[in-house]
Amino acid sequence: MPLSYPHFRKLLLLDDEAGPLEEELPRLADEGLNRRVAEDLNLQLPNVSIPWTHKVGNFTGLYSSTVPTFNPDWLTPSFPDIHLHQDLIHKCEQFVGPLTKNELRRLKLVMPSRFFPKVTKYFPMEKGIKPYYPDNVVNHYFKTRHYLHTLWKAGILYKRESTRSASFCGSPYSWEQELQHGSTSINDSKGHGTESLCTQSSGILSRPSAGSSIQGKFQQSRLGLQQKQGQLANGKQGRSGRIRSWVHTPTRWPVGVESTGTGCAYNIASRSASCFHQSAVREKTNPSLSTSKRHSSTGHAVELHSVPPGSVRSEGKGSVFSCWWLQFRDTEPCSDYCLSHIINLLEDWGPCYEHGQHHIRTPRTPARVTGGVFLVDKNPHNTTESRLVVDFSQFSRGNTRVSWPKFAVPNLQSLTNLLSSNLSWLSLDVSAAFYHLPLHPAAMPHLLVGSCGLSRYVARLSSTSRIHDHQHGTMQNLHNSCSRNLYVSLLLLFQTLGRKLHLYSHPIILGFRKIPMGVGLSPFLLAQFTSAICSVVRRAFPHCLAFSYMDDLVLGAKSVQHLESLYTAVTNFLLSVGIHLNTSKTKRWGYTLNFMGYVIGSWGSLPQDHIVQKLKDCFRKLPVNRPIDWKVCQRIVGLLGFAAPFTQCGYPALMPLYACITAKQAFVFSPTYKAFLCQQYMNLYPVARQRPGLCQVFADATPTGWGLAIGHQRMRGTFVAPLPIHTAELLAACFARSRSGAKLIGTDNSVVLSRKYTSFPWLLGCAANWILRGTSFVYVPSALNPADDPSRGRLGLYRPLLRLPFQPTTGRTSLYAASPSVPSHLPDRVHFASPLHVAWRPP
């Protein structure tokens, strides 16, 4: 007969009417009993032939992704002037006095942040914006492009101008100026009103005035290039800027000039009123030319290309309009849904390209992307705004993956010890926290996003408009992209974006100037940064508490008035160093703090209500006697594991599920096991703060017997059969707790000290977790353990009781930015008897 839930409860000693613990508990360590119970509860992981269940409630397997919904009314969030001040360290020192070396080290990590991947794979520009919403391709393209443009305008992205230069908006940092040394500019020596392009010292090139015209000739430069006589740009180009090119060494070509090896001089075919657009025809005629940035009507950063003589069309002979968008203007509409109807709505569509306020040199950056982007809801509670998801997962995959640095995440007990108090709390919201931390420009070529332009994007997604070589550039080919869907989408977008449609329809490559969210390095850097800032705040206000995890900052003070004045001072300090706070989202919690999914009060911590609700939903939908895919089990265990410390039996209760996931087997919930878990999770107990104290109760065991020292009293007992030493020590600790009721027990066993009971026989682990819940352990060496003699059967000998103080730990999540010291480097030669040599294992 299967084991019923009441019997199972009784077996686990969860009921009060159980017999004496010393007799009942050792039984749970019996292998035979554990095996029989596992068989009864169907925990044996048989190979199931019934088809697996791949969805339980909202939980799906990791490989069956939920289909996200596209919202055509998504708003792009604004990124106000986010600029972390470069003299951050100086300002912190003014605020609190000299910084500790740990604070300094952490702040230097992010000023600027650096990123060194082992290998970077470059993908074609078509993969820049992921076709994540097949029914809203065009809409998603423009919304994403608008989001990227917003980020660039906010100084969060660089725009690739040419292979070795980029432009950006916002305030420059000193390391962005240092990138150009001793460079000269090819300039007309007469310099009619045109200022020199770049001085010797500064690497930032300020924008030239819009009216500056291209000078007629180049003088003989260090390269010995002689420009042909005559105007570079034809007369039609009224608002042209200046052709700019940087020369680094006498042997190197100017940046952006790509030599084809044909030995021809430059042919600079400047197009009228629009842009210099290298379309697929250029790749077809000469594959050695890489696709590259295009030239704008304002001509601010013209890239010079050497084009083979055969492929040059002179302006006189029927020039082809090279801007795909504006080409429609002079064509006959092909249908009612021809794009030319939209293009003719406006006379002035604005420039093809925009340029930043500052120019810098960058390492060689190809016209490729290293990660795709798409939009999703900002969060489950805010579906009106969008969030940009950047997929740089290439750096976390394969043999060349980057192993990201590890950092301390506060565990539940440490967090409770730290924050469970009678303080009054508030939490601060840092807006776009990741985008505060600057990246060194050398990282830009590794973190590229962008889009290939609307024409290529649409062509790639629609099967009708395949580009054939022979008809490239013909009207037939141009109108291939016209379709009702595209027409309707663009017409709707025109109402919100206006002339920006033209700008966004051009290709663009952008590199990150601040740390992106999709790289494993970013959480580490953010955690280091906020913990250092909190450490500074904490030292400035020693009577208050400031704590952070990632971008979540909390402040605590004794009274509400005190908290408000602290809030004002801290806010002013954070704003003064350039940290942008969203003051409308400041939450005042009173005496119970909501943080990291927990509710923390003076009584301890519990999961937040929304998590309790998720647990209820999970159990309501959990099927019985049906094999559930192990990937779904992973999701279920993720939720249950979060709340496990608040249940009677804790993690050991989930061990059968963990075992099935490890074995990659389906798991079948028996009615009894489900009822057991359900009962566990419907009654949650707070995790209380550990209190300091003196240890008065000691436990010890040998494989055959156990001994206790409770104050001046000694006890001993024997086991029916010899047990593994860890099991015996765990039983002794349970007896000590049940006999004395002490919250503080001394033991010499490291496994018991760790309070992880998942490796013990399953039933014993569950029961011990409940008995020892809320108990703190102190390590006592065997030689000094007063319970050592009783465990060996000697009751007459009395060792003096130790005075063992217990101090609750806050783990590595200290309030101050302290971290373990880095071990000093050993000399190259290692002495043979050294522990380093002995402990070494082959990699």
From Swiss-Prot:
UniProt-listed SUPFAM superfamilies: DNA/RNA polymerases
Activity control summary: Activated by host HSP70 and HSP40 in vitro to be able to bind the epsilon loop of the pgRNA. Because deletion of the RNase H region renders the protein partly chaperone-independent, the chaperones may be needed indirectly to relieve occlusion of the RNA-binding site by this domain. Inhibited by several reverse-transcriptase inhibitors: Lamivudine, Adefovir and Entecavir.
Stretches assigned to the Reverse transcriptase domain: 357-600
Gene3D superfamilies: 3.30.70.270
Gene Ontology MF terms: DNA binding; DNA-directed DNA polymerase activity; metal ion binding; RNA-directed DNA polymerase activity; RNA-DNA hybrid ribonuclease activity
InterPro entries: DNA/RNA_pol_sf (IPR043502), DNApol_viral_C (IPR001462), DNApol_viral_N (IPR000201), HBV_DPOL (IPR037531), Rev_trsase/Diguanyl_cyclase (IPR043128), RT_dom (IPR000477), Viral_Replic_Matur_Polypro (IPR051320)
UniProt-annotated site: Priming of reverse-transcription by covalently linking the first nucleotide of the (-)DNA, residues: 63
PROSITE patterns cross-referenced by the UniProt entry: RT_POL
Residues at which Mg(2+) binds: 429, 551-552
Positions of region (Disordered): 202-221, 285-310
Signal peptide per UniProt: none
Stretches the record annotates as Spacer: 178-346
Region ranges (Polymerase/reverse transcriptase domain (RT)): 347-690
EC number(s) given by UniProt: 2.7.7.7, 2.7.7.49, 3.1.26.4
Location of region: Terminal protein domain (TP): 1-177
Keywords for this protein: DNA replication, DNA-binding, DNA-directed DNA polymerase, Endonuclease, Host-virus interaction, Hydrolase, Inhibition of host innate immune response by virus, Inhibition of host RLR pathway by virus, Magnesium, Metal-binding, Multifunctional enzyme, Nuclease, Nucleotidyltransferase, RNA-directed DNA polymerase, Transferase, Viral immunoevasion
GO biological process, alphabetically ordered: DNA replication; symbiont-mediated suppression of host innate immune response
Catalysed transformations (reactions): DNA(n) + a 2'-deoxyribonucleoside 5'-triphosphate = DNA(n+1) + diphosphate; Endonucleolytic cleavage to 5'-phosphomonoester
Recorded domain comment: Terminal protein domain (TP) is hepadnavirus-specific. Spacer domain is highly variable and separates the TP and RT domains. Polymerase/reverse-transcriptase domain (RT) and ribonuclease H domain (RH) are similar to retrovirus reverse transcriptase/RNase H. The polymerase/reverse transcriptase (RT) and ribonuclease H (RH) domains are structured in five subdomains: finger, palm, thumb, connection and RNase H. Within the palm subdomain, the 'primer grip' region is thought to be involved in the positioning of the primer terminus for accommodating the incoming nucleotide. The RH domain stabilizes the association of RT with primer-template.
Function: Multifunctional enzyme that converts the viral RNA genome into dsDNA in viral cytoplasmic capsids. This enzyme displays a DNA polymerase activity that can copy either DNA or RNA templates, and a ribonuclease H (RNase H) activity that cleaves the RNA strand of RNA-DNA heteroduplexes in a partially processive 3'- to 5'-endonucleasic mode. Neo-synthesized pregenomic RNA (pgRNA) are encapsidated together with the P protein, and reverse-transcribed inside the nucleocapsid.
Further remarks about this protein from its record: Hepadnaviral virions contain probably just one P protein molecule per particle.
Family: Belongs to the hepadnaviridae P protein family.
The name this protein goes by in its record: Protein P
Gene transcribed to yield this protein: P
